[in-house]
Amino acid sequence: MTALAILTIPAGFSCRAAMTTANAEYGPSEYGPSPELVAPTKSIVATVRVAKAKGWNDGGKPQGAEGTTVTAFARKLEHPRWLYVLPNGDVLVAESEAPAKPDDSKGVGGKVHKLVMKRAGSGAHPSGNRITLLRESKPGSVETHVFLQGLNSPIGMALVGNTFYVANSDAVLSFPYHSGDTELRSAPTRLTVLPAGTINHHWTKSLLASPDGRHLYVGVGSNSNAGENGLNAEHDRAAVWEIDIQTGKHRTYASGLRNPVGLAWEPQSGALWVAVNERDELGDQVPPDYMTALRDGGFYGWPFSYYGQHIDDRVKAQNPSLVAAAVAPDYALGAHTASLGLAWSAGVNLPSRFQQGMFVGQHGSWNRRQLSGYKVIFVPFINGRPTGPPIDVLTGFLDSDNHAQGRPVGVAIDNHGALLVADDVGDVVWRVSRAGNEHQAEAR
């Protein structure tokens, strides 16, 4: 962002990047395996428009796709961001906000960023720094337990055998766990230190265990939008790590991923898929966020290029040989949609069209004139590959005034085969199931 852009943003939080129609329509060409990549837009003033966080009115809820029923599985949480379902059916919710990162909020730009995040529903309160356990003791009755507390902006969770792992913003910790535990009281063991520091621009650290239980995969976001803090600040970032559970040692599994968040296994191919947030301030329609099957050792462009070999000439220290090898992603998810949550579905408690593919939680845009995201979509798969356009699963997070009643983040499939969605503005976990097959009453 330029100084001029920063100075104009607070007046209305909707700075127009160019003299173009404010209500331009953006179509499905932003999604799929072959998105239309328009020329980037350069302007003195950056586009900033974010839906003001409002929360749900009494009785309010998002709209499920035809053939589904939406219920509140749990309410009155504190900024629920991420979900994990234990083998016994207990649901874990990471309640988390950004950690202190003083060097990511200096100057006018930092102050504006804080204002934008506050408007979006983030940063208004200190991080809960805990994981809450939700146990459905009987249909319509959900117990709430503080499973872990005193954490540091936790996001990722994984269970391997009798060991429970948590990805804080600065480290992966482990705790002993036994089936049925509602609280973990043992002191943690630090497995691996993660990149953090005083910038820690993309602070969330996602976590996924390998099917054989030997490794953990961690999504580590960049320390900037497009390398403006210098490449030294990006050491070991913008990557998915592979951690050896026995030793805690890590290696870079894939790199050039600006902000890799959601991680999921595709069972037919055995591929590791990731949802990635791409860079900002190149225009309303580029580059798209995406999901892709990661190649071991693959480089995906950031910060030098996007979507293969599309050069970002704002990055002055280019690396042509690395760009030449940049892997183009598999499936575009729309520009600036903030596609975060990712979960494979083979659920039996959903309509048949949602039973083979990936659910994606789209937190919603701040960097385009027409709001995008703010919904949960489903991408169908055939033979291990995405096919066809996405299907809206959960919408209605924006009201008629474009205020955010909620914002979806993490997604997971529960032990009944229904979809769970963490809503960090509504402070709710929503449950989406096949109409006529729901087994619980609405949480109050």
Predicted regions and their residues:
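Beta-propeller domain segments
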Residues: 18-64, 102-104, 110-121, 126, ...
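Surface loop/turn motifs at the tips and blade-to-blade linkers of beta-strand repeat domains
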Residues: 74-77, 146-151, 191-199, 252-256, ...
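Short coil/turn segments that connect the beta-strands within blades of beta-propeller domains
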Residues: 88-89, 161-162, 212-214, 270, ...
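Residue position within the beta-strands of beta-propeller blades
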Residues: 92-94, 166-167, 217-219, 274-276, ...
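Short loop/turn segments immediately following the C-termini of beta-strands
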Residues: 96-98, 169-171, 177, 221-223, ...
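Asp-box/WD-like beta-propeller blade repeats and closely related beta-sheet repeat scaffolds
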Residues: 142-162, 168-210
